[in-house]
Amino acid sequence: MADVEPTIHHMGDFLRAENAAGRPWLPASHNILRAFTIPFDSIKVLIVGQDPYPTPGHPVGLSFCVAPNVHPLPKSLVNIYKELVDDLGVPMPTNGDLTPWTERGVMLLNRCLTVGVGRPNSHQGKGWEEVTEAAIRALNARTDADGKPQPLVAILWGRNAQSLEPLLTNAFIIKSPHPSPLSASRGFFGSKPFSRANQALVTMGADPVDWTL
């Protein structure tokens, strides 16, 4: 990630300028790079989001995740949970905290790491994509002691995430429409991404993910 450090510094300048202009942004600064805090070699599944929730109190630096005290849940997350329960038969989660997934090898990465309050997509094209795409390339390039690609499943929901597929040449790709209410009924429901991810991991010689929350 050293090659994108100048971009990260540039984004810090951009965010300070936004603050100075009276345009607040999310998530809190200590959560902006939270997706990168899990051990890189532990990552088995990548789930890509577009940008953080633009509602204060909602985004916590992990794609689709909210803090445990947030109710009602964002509608996209409600639909993810419906599909999780339908796919695996696990209990319906009681809150929107996806942190346990990250502790089991799931990277929850937004392509754009910040957003203006109440302004979806407002920070797209400002530089974050260069940072997150560098991370995805590095994930894809990981190899084991024998030089073979490390097991990786990429779950790509919606066209924005699916545009990253060319960077994921060594990953097993699972793609469907986005879980938002606008598109979930067009192929997200019934796509069984969680069981398919586990089947792919086992085929690659890796342990399946415990998706229970």
Swiss-Prot record:
It comes from the Bacteria. GO terms for biological process: base-excision repair, AP site formation via deaminated base removal. It is found in: Cytoplasm. It catalyses: Hydrolyzes single-stranded DNA or mismatched double-stranded DNA and polynucleotides, releasing free uracil. InterPro entries: UDG_fam1, Ura-DNA_Glyclase_AS, Uracil-DNA_glycosylase-like, Uracil-DNA_glycosylase-like_sf. The keyword Cytoplasm applies. The keyword tRNA processing does not apply. One of its GO terms (cellular component) is cytoplasm. Excises uracil residues from the DNA which can arise as a result of misincorporation of dUMP residues by DNA polymerase or due to deamination of cytosine. This is Uracil-DNA glycosylase. The lineage of its organism: Bacteria, Bacillati, Actinomycetota, Actinomycetes, Bifidobacteriales.
